[in-house]
Design a protein with these regions (language model features):
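Phosphate-ester processing/binding pockets and catalytic centers
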Residues: 1-239
Length: 239
């Protein structure tokens, strides 16, 4: 059995038009280690679980838990990436589907299908290996039935049967799989910005203030992992 976690990201101010959906697939036997990796990253930086940790707070010390510095947030994100999608520690299969045309309802559903179908390996033939449970972040503009239909289409294309229905959640630290999907989607935007939009990576930092050399070095390492890790795939742009 596998679990799939879905979240999306965008930043219309600094990366105009970019919209991405990330799907993270985890074998049930590896889920607990993924959860522990996310929990450890949050514990190590002292993050208060009353505040949501997500991609958009990584570069801002005034969002979320304000007692945690930008450097500590970057360390937490770096730790999550290293423990889940790096070549040495790959415990998930992740796909980021994206467009530069913005995130309308139609685009969102198409990106969900792309990301989910790409992150899942073909279903195994042993008993229970063809089952998948899917958890997705709530998005007000998307009707639950439309999301469910899109996901059923995606998992069926890889030979899976959906357990019950899609579980739609409100993001929080209590949903580490969805949290990880959000962080990876945002870091995917960071990677996109570095290749396509001159100066836009730095603009993602709060106030557009250039971070320390140490933070930039760590983010460079994160980008290298995302671009080289076999566990993460960037789906060709949706046009």
């Amino acid at each position: 059995m596998r679990f799939v976690f879905i979240d999306e990201t965008e930043n219309s101010t600094h990366v105009p038009g970019f919209y991405a959906v990330c799907a993270v697939a985890v074998d049930a036997t590896k889920y607990n280690r993924v959860r522990q990796a996310v929990d450890k990253a949050l514990d190590d930086c002292g993050w208060c679980r009353d505040h949501e940790f997500k991609g958009s707070v990584i570069f801002s010390s005034t969002k979320g838990d304000t007692s945690v510095t930008t450097e500590q947030r970057v360390d937490a994100a770096n730790s999550m990436v290293a423990a889940t999608v790096s070549k040495a520690n790959a415990r998930v299969s992740c796909a980021i589907a994206w467009t530069d045309k913005g995130g309308g309802v139609k685009q969102h559903l198409e990106l969900v299908v792309q990301a989910v179908s790409r992150c899942l390996v073909p279903a195994g033939k042993a008993a229970g290996k063809d089952l998948v449970a899917v958890f997705a972040d709530n998005k007000d503009q998307i009707k639950p039935r439309d999301l469910s239909d899109a996901i059923k289409k995606a998992v069926k294309s890889r030979g899976y049967a959906l357990v019950e229905d899609v579980v739609i959640v409100s993001s929080s630290c209590d949903w580490p799989g969805v949290l990880l999907a959000d962080v990876l989607a945002y870091l995917g935007m960071w990677t996109y910005a570095g290749h396509k939009l001159a100066g836009s990576q730095l603009s993602l930092f709060e106030g557009g203030i250039e971070p320390s050399a140490d933070v930039l070095r760590k983010m460079g390492t994160v980008q290298e992992v995302l671009e080289s890790g076999a566990a993460l795939q960037f789906v060709p742009k949706l046009v």
